[in-house]
Curated annotation (Swiss-Prot):
Domain of life: Bacteria
Pfam families: H2O2_YaaD (PF03883)
Organism for this UniProt entry: Bordetella pertussis (strain Tohama I / ATCC BAA-589 / NCTC 13251)
Stated family: Belongs to the UPF0246 family.
Entry protein name: UPF0246 protein BP2452
Lineage, opening ranks: Bacteria, Pseudomonadati, Pseudomonadota, Betaproteobacteria, Burkholderiales
Record GO biological process: response to hydroperoxide
GO cellular component, one term: cytosol
Amino acid sequence: MLFLLSPAKKLDYDSPVHVETHTQPLFVDQAAALIKVLKTKSADEIAELMSLSPALAELNAGRYGAWKRSFTQANSRQAVLAFNGDVYEGLQADTLSARQLDWAQDHVVILSGLYGALRPLDLMQPYRLEMGTRLHTPKGKNLYEYWGSGIAEYLNERQAGAKAPVIVNLASEEYFKVVDLKTLKARVVQCVFQDWKNGAWKVISFHAKRARGLMARYAIAHKVARPEGLQGFDSEGYAYDAAASSADKLVFRRKQA
């Protein structure tokens, strides 16, 4: 069973890293080709393409310029420790043990506009390239066309030996869309996190993002091997709602935010 996560815009390359173990990213050729396209753009063009402030556009133009095909601990850090948004505040990877990170390495995949798919301990150079970016490349007019069926094929390879492969989607719609479902062989299980607000159950973006990270942490801590094993998730007041759920859609709700 594999768990899919979105990346984060917010990055942390300053905090001390508590594990030395690292691996090399798998889609370096594809990332290098994207960097080649991005390097042709001025900071103003990047600002327009990605709706960034001039300062952020300059920062990322500099990142593309500094990007190298060789990933070292000097220019990179492990992906799960570099990402620092809402999902990763829920995951709190900096408090996972080396053994837990090893389990995550085998069961968690982080989707990425630049790197395609990252394992938690894959080294990653800093970047900004959201999956929804309309970046024109020789392969098409956006990143979905660029990655094509490649991510789904990779996920198939990862579960080639499984009798009943399962993908648990904890990624956003923007990122999960890069997984070509016609190519994917695995059963997909969605996790939905809802809060009670104004008399109704609603998905509140900030809370849902954090909850996806909390769920990934729960799966890692309990080495969850089947979707049913996720039903015990109870972090920060969430509880599984059997009546609102189905076999492939697990709904978790809470009344206090």
